[in-house]
From Swiss-Prot:
InterPro entries referenced in this protein's UniProt entry, alphabetically: Golgi_SNAP_su1 (IPR023601)
Record's compositionally biased regions (Basic and acidic residues): 41-51
Pfam families, sorted: V-SNARE_C (PF12352)
Chief place of localization: Golgi
CDD domains linked: SNARE_GS28
Protein name, entry field: Golgi SNAP receptor complex member 1
Stated induction or repression of this protein's expression: Expression induced by hydrogen peroxide in neuronal cells. By monocrotaline in pulmonary epithelial cells (at protein level). Negatively regulated by OSBPL7 via GABARAPL2 leading to degradation on proteasomes (at protein level).
Residues recorded with modification Phosphoserine: S141
Stretches in topological domain Cytoplasmic: 2-229
Region annotation Disordered: where it falls in the sequence: 38-59
Amino acid sequence: MAAGTSSYWEDLRKQARQLENELDLKLVSFSKLCTSYSHSSTRDGRRDRYSSDTTPLLNGSSQDRMFETMAIEIEQLLARLTGVNDKMAEYTNSAGVPSLNAALMHTLQRHRDILQDYTHEFHKTKANFMAIRERENLMGSVRKDIESYKSGSGVNNRRTELFLKEHDHLRNSDRLIEETISIAMATKENMTSQRGMLKSIHSKMNTLANRFPAVNSLIQRINLRKRRDSLILGGVIGICTILLLLYAFH
């Protein structure tokens, strides 16, 4: 029975690690999609005076479809990983070996922390993408209003020129901000990759510790004995010090 329950726990851990690896790859691709959307919208904004609006709209709609598809896939993976974590929690509550509960709870908490990090990263990237898309839609509407005004009036007066120059300044400011965001996202991708390597090393160390519980028990007994010996030695030193003081004052 113990072998069967242990096999069930290992199967759950295997499922959790597989889903975590899939989520890690999906989130990196999702972040790259957000970055490419920002860059393409900037390029489209710079050349929209010399080309029609057909190509940017097609590019935007294609990226929007990719965004929706990837968001659904990531949400499904998060839901599956949540279900696996819930099953692991049920197993730890029903496990009949008290000595293993601490190790199981530690492993479960680690998987929960990973799930929380992935969920937070997904919602943050999704919010950034939505903000960029909303801003680009707003700027596109402004450009259309300007072009409509120019074609309707046919007058290229000083006021319109100043307005267009101000609009160009805003576009340049947006481009600088987007480049800064791109650098930050690239840094985040590198940190995510390093976190994956550290997670793999930590997982292997926990696996070794769980496979050899006798080693953990022996280490704990050694630490307890060292602590006891330290207390005894401290007591002996204290008694000797008191006796020396009494002898010195007499």
